[in-house]
Amino acid sequence: MIPYHDLLERILSDGAEKHDRTGTGTLSVFGHQLRFDLAAGFPMLTTKRLPLKAIIHELLWFLQGDTNIKYLHDHGVTIWDEWADANGDLGPVYGAQWRSWPTADGRSIDQIAHVVDMIRRNPDSRRLIVTAWNPADVEKMALPPCHCLFQFYVANGRLSCQLYQRSADVFLGVPFNIASYALLTMMVAQVTGLKPGDFIHTLGDAHLYSNHLEQARLQLTRAPRALPAMAINPAVTDIFGFRYEDFTLHGYDPHPHIKAEVAV
C-alpha cells in the first residue's frame, strides 16, 4: 500500500489549509490517483487495522438498496450513526441511487442490475457507469455521496473499476473505500465470469483533517506488510446473492488500530 503512504506524505508536505463544512479544518490537495492490481493481493491497509466486518456489511447494505441503519445495527456496525435521524433513516443515499434511481416519469432505474447485465452483454461498452450523485436528491440526503461515480472496464478477460471520489477523508475514509470498491470489483467480476483487474481510485479534494495529522505521521513510521488475499464463495453467481459468510480474508497481519475522531 505504498501509493496510500505516498498520498499521506503529499498532503502533509504540500497540502493547502482549508476550512470545511465540519469546522475542523483540513490540509488538502486536489486531484490524486491510486492504482491497485487486484491480482497482487487484496488492498487492505496493513499499517493500521481496518474493520473488515463493517466494510463488508456496508457494501452489502448498499447493494440491498437500503438507506436505514437498522441492518447495520443488527450486524454490530455503527459507522453511519452520526448522520441518521431518530428513525435511523438517511434519506436517498448510496443504496437508493444505486438500486432505484428515480426518473422524471415516475419509474426507477436499478443501476447495479443494469451495469452487471451490460458487462455480460456488451463488455466493450464505455457506458458501464454507476452514479450516486443525483442533484435532485442531494438536499434530501443526510450526507451527499463522497464516492460518487464508478466505471467498469473489461479487457483481456479482466474487469477493472475506476472510482471518482469528490471528497476524500484520507485518514479514516479512503482506506475503507479502497477495500470496499476492490471487493465490489471482485464480486462483479465473479458474477460476470471475469477475473479481477485493477482498482483505480481517483480523488478530487483529498484531505487530512487537522485532528488526524499526528495519526497520519504515526502511520508513516510503520512499514507496510504483505497484502492479504480475499476468498469469495465461488458458488455465488448473483450480485445480490452475496452474504457476509461468503467472504474470507487470508493472511491479514496489520499494525494496531490508530484511533481518530470522525468529522461530522
From Swiss-Prot:
GO cellular component terms?
cytosol
Positions annotated as active site in the UniProt record: C146
What biological-process terms (Gene Ontology) are attached?
dTMP biosynthetic process; dTTP biosynthetic process; methylation
What is the species listed in this Swiss-Prot or TrEMBL entry? Rhodopseudomonas palustris (strain HaA2)
Q: Give the enzyme's EC designation.
A: 2.1.1.45
Give the matching PROSITE patterns. THYMIDYLATE_SYNTHASE
Annotated (6R)-5,10-methylene-5,6,7,8-tetrahydrofolate binding lies at: D169, A263
Going by the UniProt record, its keywords in alphabetical order are: Cytoplasm, Methyltransferase, Nucleotide biosynthesis, Transferase
Task performed by this protein: Catalyzes the reductive methylation of 2'-deoxyuridine-5'-monophosphate (dUMP) to 2'-deoxythymidine-5'-monophosphate (dTMP) while utilizing 5,10-methylenetetrahydrofolate (mTHF) as the methyl donor and reductant in the reaction, yielding dihydrofolate (DHF) as a by-product. This enzymatic reaction provides an intracellular de novo source of dTMP, an essential precursor for DNA biosynthesis.
- InterPro entries per record: Thymidate_synth/dCMP_Mease, Thymidate_synth/dCMP_Mease_dom, Thymidate_synth/dCMP_Mease_sf, Thymidylate_synthase, Thymidylate_synthase_AS
So what does this thing catalyse? dUMP + (6R)-5,10-methylene-5,6,7,8-tetrahydrofolate = 7,8-dihydrofolate + dTMP
Binding residues for dUMP, per the UniProt record? R21, R126, R127, R166, S167, A168, D169, N177, H207, L208, Y209
| HAMAP family reported in the protein's UniProt record | Thymidy_synth_bact (MF_00008)
- Output the Gene Ontology terms for molecular function: thymidylate synthase activity
Top-level taxon of origin: Bacteria
Family the entry assigns? Belongs to the thymidylate synthase family. Bacterial-type ThyA subfamily.
Which compartments is it annotated to reside in?
Cytoplasm
Name the pathway.
Pyrimidine metabolism; dTTP biosynthesis
Quaternary structure per UniProt? Homodimer.
Q: What class of enzyme is it?
A: transferase
Its recorded name reads Thymidylate synthase
